Structures are given as structure tokens and as C-alpha cells.
Amino acid sequence: MDQSLSQQIKKEAQNLGFDLVGIAPAGEAPHWDRLREWVERGFHAGMEYIPRRLSTYRHPSGVLPGCRSLVMVAASYLPVPLANIPPGLGRIAAYATRTDYHTVLREKLRLLAGFIEALIPGTQTRPAVDTAPLMERSFGWLAGLGWIGKNTMLIHPQFGSYFLLGVVLTTAELPPDPPFSKNYCGRCQACLEVCPTGALVAPFTLDARRCISYWTIEAKTVPPARLRPFFDQWFFGCDLCQQVCPWNRRILRSGGVPGTESLLVVEARQLPPHVAMSEVLRASDSILRQWFRDTPLWRAKPAGLRRNAAIVLGNCLRKEMPSYENGCSNAAGRSDISPSNISSGSATPIGQLTSRSKRSPGDFPENAAQPLSPQAADWQDVLASALQDPDPCVRRAAAWALAGRPTLTVGSILHEVFARETDPEVRQEISALLSEISTASGSSAEGP
């Protein structure tokens, strides 16, 4: 194997703007057995494309027949400090605040693939950016780009976990780099402890059924009611397990890695890190497309974005309750939020959870008498309008959000909507909310 070929390929990757580059041999994917076990335990949630292509993940030849090497690259992106934001705004995960990374990285990877084919005549290549059935993080570790942390992210000593991976698979046999030699997580448990829904069920293990990022990006339905309060103001994705990682501390403090200029920063337009949720709910599909079409947010599509916005506003309304305790709690290790009771509905009622919204039935009459702030009144108006959205998931989320500040008016609106609603899941959601409002207010009125 010609070492000079590898050096030329790495140099070209750096010239194209990639921050890290390494070469991994094409063998059975490291940690494939763990992926299979992860799927068997149902941790993939609704991402059925993973078990459907599980055998393909086992070896890169399933992506490129005859593959012998993987050129792994990484492009860093800028973090967004987790500062307090005004109510009514939604947080966006840092990676999604710029032009879709698929667009930027794919073009650079095509150029790198063309360079490899010109350098080594007769070789075949295939570039990929997290859309092929390939265990990129495992091969990133194998190529020496970092270690896999307890938050399941690939972590590099200089860049932390604020980078995205790409790969060029090739039939050329290139000298491989050594795997990253050590895991520097040590005894740190910060990521497990900060996760509000307990999605990191163990070190290096993520249960997507509890993950805020899964529910706001990948899911096509509405998250379980018991999880929604823990989303707080996360509108798209979640960065909490990265924000607390000690290896990201310097990057967060300096706003990036000093002395580097990532292609994801130079060649991408900037989105604001926070978005007004009422505007998302008011916007037409065409307007949402205009705002988000070339960003990662478009993966959620208009219905998903409106669903997420409604949940954020519901949490903001709950924050206006006098009984609301504005603290940072988490569900890690809790016995009342588990895969079985999330799906079966047997978890402890929200009012009894150790969550941000500690309310009891006796609180509601007093709370209902409290005047709404002007912005909360606006949220209620836009949520009431969202009850007529054509997508049932949006209607479910809007009903739950509207009930975040239960009043006689809200009860009346929900009764009217229930009377005309035909979708069984939306009817079930509204029925449960009306029963909760009725019980909490001490009313003798019967539910629907």
C-alpha cells in the first residue's frame, strides 16, 4: 500500500475545508453487534429504516461492492450557548442553524471522490453523508477521528463533539490510520444526568423513544404526553448532552475552535438559533418552505414543525402558571418514565412527576383566575386556530398546549372542537384533557 496516496488524499480533504480526515479499513463494522442488540431492544423507536437495512450496516460492501477503504472526514460547526431565552421562542440544535449540511458536505465529498478516482485510475468511489446504511461514528473511531462518548457522540480532543461526519468509500486499498486509542469520558456522567427525559439509559446507549431530538426531527406522530413538559423550549433537536460535556467547554466559551474556519460556517447561510413559535404556527406551508427548505429543519416538514411549535407554546403557557417551578430537572434513572409505561400509559401522571411543572388539582382554580399576559393570550389564539389544522398530529399537540393554561374558555373551546373532531386519536387526546381540566377545577361537569 502506497503511503503517499493516503497523504495526497488527506491533503486534498483539508484543502476542501474538512477539519479532520482519517482512513479506516473496510471490514465488519465495529460495534455492529451492539447495533443489532440496540434494535432488538426497540431503541430505534419509529426509525424502521434501521432494522429494515440492518444487515447492510454490517459491512461497507453493502454500500459499495468491493469496498476496501473508507476515507472518513469531519467538518466542525459552531455551538449555540444555552442561555435563557424569552418565552414563546423555540430553540434549534446548533447543527441545524445553517444551510443543510448534506448539501454542503455532499458537494465537497463528490470533489474528494473525483480526486481519488483521478489519483488511482480504475478505482470506484461512493461519497455519503449519513444517508447510507453505514455506522459512520464507529468507522470514524476506527479512522482515528475520536472516541465514542457516553452520549453516543464521536468526541475529538480539539473539536469536542461539534462536528459532522462524511465518508468516501473506495475500492482502493489505502494504508489505514490507527483507531483512536483511548476513551476520555472517564467517570464523567454529566450527559446522562442532564438528559431531561432519561434518553441516555446507560453509558453509550440512547433510547430514541425518550429522545427530544428523535421526537422533534424523526418522529411522524406526537410524543407521549408524559414526555412533552420535558421538551421545554426545544423546537428542533436538542444539544443538552453536548452542552454539558467537558470536552466542549472550551469550544462553547470561545464560540468555536480557535484558528479554524469550517466549511460549514464559510459556505452556509445562518439561521437565528431561536424562532418565534407563534409565527411558525401562523405560517403557510409555502412560507415555511421558504424559511426552512434549505436547512435541516425541513426534515420535520410543515406538520412536524407546527407540532413542535405547539408543544413549545404549551410549555411556555405552563411556565406562566403561578405553581410553575422554573428549575432544571431530569428524568434520568426515573422509574416513572420507562419504555413500557410511555407506550402503555401507566406512568405517573404529569402532575405527580418531579418535573418543571409541579402542579396539583388544587392549584387550578387559583391559576385560572390569574390574568393572561398579552403574549400568552396571543399564544392561546394561535393554538386555538391550530386546532383546525389539517394534520391530526398538529391538532393533538395544539389541544394539549392550549390546556397548559386551563380556563373556562379553554374548556369551552376544547368541547366545541371535540364535538366536530372525527380523528379517533385527536378525540382521545381532547377527552383526556377535558377530564383533567374538569377534575383539576373541581367541576362537576362531565367530560365528553
Q: Which role fits each region the language model picked out?
A:
Residues M1-Y184, P223, D232:
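Auxiliary alpha/beta "docking" domains used to position bulky ligands
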Residues L288-W291, S373-L387, T407-F418, G442-P448:
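Amphipathic alpha-helical scaffolding segments comprising HEAT/armadillo-like alpha-solenoid repeats
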Residues S254-T260, R318-A377, S438-G447:
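Intrinsically disordered, low-complexity terminal tails and inter-domain linkers enriched
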Residues G255-L317:
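C-type cytochrome heme-c attachment and multiheme electron-transfer modules
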Residues P302, P390-D391, T422-D423:
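Short inter-helical turns and helix N-cap capping residues of alpha-solenoid HEAT/ARM repeat scaffolds
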Residues R307-K319, E366-S373, S385, R395-T407, ...:
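Structural detector for internal amphipathic alpha-helices that build alpha-solenoid repeat scaffolds
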